[in-house]
Amino acid sequence: MSCPIATGRLLVIRLSELKLPLIALPVEARRASDAPAETDEDRKLAPHPLDALRQLAAHALGIDEAGVSDLTVFKRSFDARKQNLLVVYIVDVTISDDALEKSLLVKHLKNSHIQATPNITWLPPVHAPADWGKAKQDRPVVVGFGPCGIFAALVLAQMGLKPIVIERGTPVRQRTKDTWGLWRKHVLNPRSNVQFGEGGAGTFSDGKLYSQIKDPRHLGRKVMQEFVRFGAPEDILFAAHPHIGTFKLVKVVEGLREEIIRLGGEVRFEQRVVDIEYEANSIAALRIQDYATNQTYTLPAHHVVLALGHSARDTFTMLHRHAVAMQAKPFSIGVRIEHPQSVIDRARWGQHAGHPLLGAADYKLVHHAANGRTVYSFCMCPGGTVVAATSEVGRVVTNGMSQYSRNERNANAGLVVGIDPTDYPTDPDAFEAELGQEIGNAVRHDTPNAVDTFHPLSGLVLQRQLEAVAYTLGGSNYEAPAQLVGDFIANRASTALASVEPSYKPGVKMIHLNSALPQFVTDAMREALPLFGQKIKGFDMHDAVMTGVETRTSSPLRIDRDDVSLQSPSIAGLYPAGEGAGYAGGILSAGVDGIKVGEAVANAIFPNITAKRP
C-alpha cells in the first residue's frame, strides 16, 4: 500500500518539525527508495510510521490520540547533524471534532509549527465550450516542449483549449539516441540534443523538483502531482529535496504528451518557428519550418506561448529583429567540478555516510570574493555525471545529470561566478561574428541611451565566444578542457588526470582553465576553493576535476511581459514564458510559470467564461 498523500481539504491542521529517531521507522522503510526492485511488492513505497506520528501530533496539539481521526505525511527530511539520525516530518491531521479543530487553530495561532493546511487544489479559471477550437487560428500555440511548454499545453488542454505545440526537436526517445550520439561518437545533432527536443533541457539533468520561488497558489504541487500521475516516483510528493532523474523523466514526459493529445491538443515535432507575422501590433501567424519535408508553412495564431528554453538563440535573434522588447540580464559562468561521491558523503553525513535512506549527499556553497564577485555551487548532482550540453556546432558546454538512483561514482556541481551586462561584449565586430552582419551593423550605428546601454543579445554573444574557445581548447572534437583542482589553485596547467576519473563524455583534454574563462572568474574561483574546502572537507582536494565551460546556467536575457496579462508589451498575443524568457530557473519553476501563462491565455480567450467550482 502506497503512502497517503496530503490533500487540499480545508480545516486540516499542518504540524511541522515532528522528529523521530531512525529506529522508529518500520524495517521496510529503512531501505533506499531506489534499492533494486525484483517484484511489484518491492517497488511499492515503504510505509511511514503513522502510529508514532499520530502520538507526536496529539502531544503537540495537547489532545488525546483518539482525537486525531486522520494523518497524512506532507514532507519528510533527515537531520544528520548529531550522532543520532533524526527523521523530520511535516504532517496534516484531521481532528474528529470540527469545533475542536477550529479552537486548536485559534489556540496555536502564534505557533509557526501548527497552522491551517492550505488548500492546494488547482482549479482551472475557465473551461472552453465543447465545440470550441474548430478554427485553427482560435487554438493557442505553444512554442517549445520543455517543462514550461509542457505545463502550459497541459493546462490549456485541461481547460478544453486544444493547444498546438511546436517543438524543433525530436520525441524524447529519439532525442535520447541523438544525445548519446554526441557523448559516444562525437556527433552533434543541432536539432536534437541536451537542449532541444521533447522534455527540454531538464530531461538531461538531475531532475530536481524544488525551487525557492514564491508559490502562494501551490502550483508547484500541481506540477509534482501531474508528474506522479504519469509515472514519477510517488516519494517526490513528500521528499524534502525531490528529484526524478533522466530515465524516469523520459516515461513521464511521454505520458504528459499523450494526455495533451487525448484532450484534443496536438504536438508537432521537428518544426521550428523561423518568423512571426503580426497586424496592428498583435500576433497573427507563425512561419514554421518543417524539417521532415524541408518546407515552410504559415500557422495562423492569435495567442502564442513562447516557452523557448534558454538556448533558442536563433529565435531570440528573430524576435529582436521584430523589436520585441527584451533586455540583457545577469547569469553565471564557470565550470563543472567533480569529486568522489564518498568524499561528499563523509563530509556531509559523517558517521551516517552510506546509510541507504540518506542516499548520496548534496551541498550548497557560496563565497563573496575580494574582487566583488560571488562564487557559488550550481545545480549540484549527487552520484551523477557531467554531460556535453552543446546545441551548436563548434561549441562546448557542460551540464550535470543524475539518474533517480544517484549511484554513479562522482558528485558534480557547477562552480560558477555571477556576471552582469557590464561584463558583456560591446564590440560591433563581436556581434557580427556571432550574430551576423545585420546585427553587427546595427550595433555600429546604435547610440546607447541612458535607459538601456546594453544590447539585449550581448550576453548571448559572450556565451558563444566562451563556448567556441572551449571547443578549440578541447581539441575541436567536442571533448572539453579540464584541470585538476590542485593545479588550478597552484595556478599551473594540468598535464594528466589523477585519482578522480572525469565523467564527461566524449572526453577531456587537460589544460590551464585560465585560458578558458575571464580572469575575474578564475581569480574568484581560485580564492573560493580553499574556503569551500573548510566547509566540506576534501572539496579542494588536489585530484578533483574541473571541466569547462558552464555557460548556460540561465537565460542571458529577459523578454519583457506585462505583470497582469503576461503578454509582450510589443506584440499582443505573445506570452514570453519559462526559463528562456527569464521567468524561471529549473524544472519546477518553469512548470509553474507554464501554468500561470496557460491560465493567462485562457483568460484572454474567454474573459467572461468561468469554470464551475466544485
Which ranges hold each PLM region?
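Residues forming the flavin
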Residues: 3-72, 76-85, 93-94, 98-204, ...
